[in-house]
Design a protein with these regions (language model features):
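Autoprocessing domains of the Hint superfamily
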Residues: 1-199
Length: 199
């Protein structure tokens, strides 16, 4: 099962809790990239990524309450501003690029809408969304259709986070980062998010 993903990037100073070289570390995404930059850097258009699956790197995933295998670290050095900070009702925040799209609850509980960050407003609820669920999981998932993509999506119990505030902020960096994990989830600065697109 794959995840509907955030298509934007995460600010390099956001932190991740992870295990590497037998140590639990809490470091920024930029520091993790620099730590792993001794490995070959691959290119995919303007994005760069490092395959870390063989490095025994594990990233914390609060949904599964475990450190899960990290497969890739992705850097987009040409990712342009603006940056936005989202504040949630549990006081957690995350800084992401304006290209980020989020699944949010629609008018019907069985539907969701995908919105770019500059279309979000206070009171909307971010939801976890999967696609391609197995037939034997029907009791756990609720089918919805989304005419925009002509794909059947399902809302899950991954998470719901109410947005309190979306703030456009000025950041000096023009690079963003993403991770790919085995579970498709990881925590950034205390916020559980869906990972980058699987390659």
């Amino acid at each position: 099962m794959k995840k509907i993903v955030y298509t934007g990037g995460i600010y390099g100073d956001e932190f991740v809790k992870y295990i590497f070289d037998r140590k639990i570390r809490v470091e920024s995404l930029k520091t993790i990239w620099e730590r792993m930059s001794h490995l070959p850097v691959q290119h995919d258009g303007f994005k760069e990524y490092i395959n870390v699956a063989d490095e025994k790197m594990r990233v914390f995933d609060s949904k599964n309450e475990a450190f899960v295998r990290c497969k890739q670290i992705i850097r987009s050095p040409m990712e342009a501003n603006p940056w936005y900070q989202i504040t949630f009702d549990d006081d957690s925040t995350i800084i992401v690029t304006g290209k980020t799209r989020f699944p949010v609850k629609g008018k019907s509980l069985s539907r969701y809408e995908k919105k770019y960050i500059d279309e979000l407003f206070a009171g909307e609820v971010l939801v976890g969304v999967d696609y391609g669920a197995a037939a034997d999981s029907k009791d756990k998932f609720k089918n919805v259709s989304n005419e925009e993509d002509d794909i059947e999506y399902i809302i899950t119990d991954l998470f719901e986070k109410k947005i309190v505030r979306v703030t456009k902020i000025d950041k000096a960096s023009n690079e963003s980062f993403q991770l790919v994990t085995d579970t498709g989830l990881f925590d950034v600065s205390g916020t559980l998010i869906l990972d980058a697109k699987m390659r």
